[in-house]
Amino acid sequence: MKVTFLGHAGFLIEGSKKIVIDPFLTGNPLAKAKAEEVKADLVLVSHGHGDHLGDAVAIAGQSNALVVSVYELADYCARHGAQSHGMHIGGSRAFDGVKIKLTPAWHGAGFGTGEGPMEYLGNPCGFVIKIDGKTIYHSGDTGLFGDMELIGRFNSLDLALLPIGDNFTMGPEDALEAVKMLKPKTVIPMHYNTWPLIEQDPAEFKSAVEAATSAEVKILSPGESMEL
């Protein structure tokens, strides 16, 4: 299975199905891929902020893909022309062999264009994704929370995708504590260095995690892939 970092919190998972998560490409200063180049079967969106909703509707439309998110955000995507399936935190569903479960995330979720008030698009979430015998956790934008221990207890995680940027999400120190609770085999840091406000050194995070846990940290540049 191939996992490609699209930049910021965006990933493309390619196995028996293609899954795109939080595809913020247009307007992303570090993204290498263009939205029109990305094809998917499922598009997962963790919350309604523009740097996560991003190009989800466009990618879903050009691929005839299904957007999966919390109900309010799925409804928003449907109103903008995308096929969508709404869920809520704690719920799970299988989509043609891919099982998705929504997990909590501590963050906000409004969408705005800069004109007028933001539109509420439901609670933010993370995802536990089971595909081709592998289990992947994408936390979405979140702070550290104790129930990460339950996610790690109930799932043997092959890969965890965790933010380290601080300010809007947990920083490297809290992300290390998340790894201790989640107990994944591999971690890819995300949501850092897109802008100066979330600048971090992923090599320092890698050193701290690998010194304190059995997890391996893979640092991917936007456009770079790894085999899982």
From Swiss-Prot:
SMART domains cross-referenced by the UniProt entry: Lactamase_B (SM00849)
GO terms of molecular function: hydrolase activity
Pfam family, one: Lactamase_B_3
Alphabetical keyword list: Hydrolase
Family listed: Belongs to the UPF0173 family.
Protein name: UPF0173 metal-dependent hydrolase PTH_1415
Lineage: Bacteria, Bacillati, Bacillota, Clostridia, Eubacteriales
